Amino acid sequence: MVLKVKMGDIGVGKSPESIETLLGSCVAIILYDKGKKIGGLAHVMLPKSRMQKEKNPGKYVDTAIPELITKIVKMGARKDRLTVKLAGGAAMFGNNSNNIDVGKKNIEASKIEIKKIGLRVSSEDLGGDTGRTITLSLKDGSVMVRKGSELKTI
């Protein structure tokens, strides 16, 4: 079964499922426990929550990460065994000085928050100017990244 995660949402599951999302400037924060074959993905849209944190914790980097950890730990994952992968954060609107590079800000915030909770990023596919589709296999924790006709695993 493939669980599709929408913008601002969080999806969790266990082997043999997979989790998929489509990214532009948003970032996918992927956590996986190899021992239990449990993982999840947060499709974050913005770096920081200001108001209404409880309403949609998956929308913001600073609220999505703790929520994702809580959800997968409830399924049986162990925080001390989690691997972290990041994908997305494209500059979808060019590098015009009038535009705020939301993708870059999402990337920076994701790395800061991951470090704050004592985890580190094991692999990533970030930036650029092209959207991507990612699929997390909960069988082995691999993440397939598709950008146009380009396909790679992180």
UniProtKB/Swiss-Prot annotation:
What top-tier enzyme class does this entry carry? Answer: hydrolase
Asked whether the keyword Glycoprotein is assigned, the reply is no
Q: Which reaction does it catalyse?
A: L-glutaminyl-[protein] + H2O = L-glutamyl-[protein] + NH4(+)
- What is the name attached to this protein's record? Probable chemoreceptor glutamine deamidase CheD
Cross-referenced Pfam families? CheD
Instruction: Tell me, in a sentence or two, what this protein's role is.
Output: Probably deamidates glutamine residues to glutamate on methyl-accepting chemotaxis receptors (MCPs), playing an important role in chemotaxis.
Q: What family, per the record?
A: Belongs to the CheD family.
Name the keywords, alphabetized: Chemotaxis, Hydrolase
Q: Which GO terms describe its molecular function?
A: protein-glutamine glutaminase activity
Q: Please name the source species.
A: Methanococcus maripaludis (strain C5 / ATCC BAA-1333)
GO terms (BP aspect)? chemotaxis
Enzyme Commission number(s) of this protein: 3.5.1.44
